[in-house]
């Protein structure tokens, strides 16, 4: 099972990244758990300095921007 963490305060960009992750997981029938991390104190512990942040299976893949859907799909499928 993939473990996907979307890190951020819940701002519009964080919500968009979470929605994109859900789309990619659903469209590719992936077994994944998507977790939102909104506790600012955890950001640094997770290696996130800018939000939104994306962590897949413990690896920071993006921070401070929203990847394109195709890039996100590539990252998630490659991490599976």
Protein language model regions, located:
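Generic recognition of short, well-ordered alpha-helical segments
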Residues: 16-19, 49, 67
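Amphipathic, hydrophobic secondary-structure cores in small proteins
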Residues: 34-47
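Conserved helix-turn-beta segment immediately C-terminal to the redox Cys motif
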Residues: 20-34
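Structural micro-motif
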Residues: 47-55
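Local sequence-structure signature of Cys/Sec-based thiol-disulfide redox active-site neighborhoods
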Residues: 1-20
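Residue-level recognition of oxygen-bearing side chains
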Residues: 16, 42, 71
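Non-catalytic, surface beta->alpha helical segment in thiol-disulfide oxidoreductase systems
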Residues: 59-80
């Amino acid at each position: 099972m993939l473990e996907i963490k979307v890190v951020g305060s819940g701002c519009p960009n964080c919500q968009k990244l979470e929605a994109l992750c859900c789309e990619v997981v659903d469209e590719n029938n992936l077994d994944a758990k998507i977790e939102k991390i909104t506790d600012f104190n955890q950001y640094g512990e997770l290696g996130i300095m800018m939000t939104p942040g994306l962590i897949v299976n413990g690896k920071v893949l993006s921070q401070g921007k929203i990847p394109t859907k195709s890039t996100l799909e590539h990252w998630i499928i490659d991490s599976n």
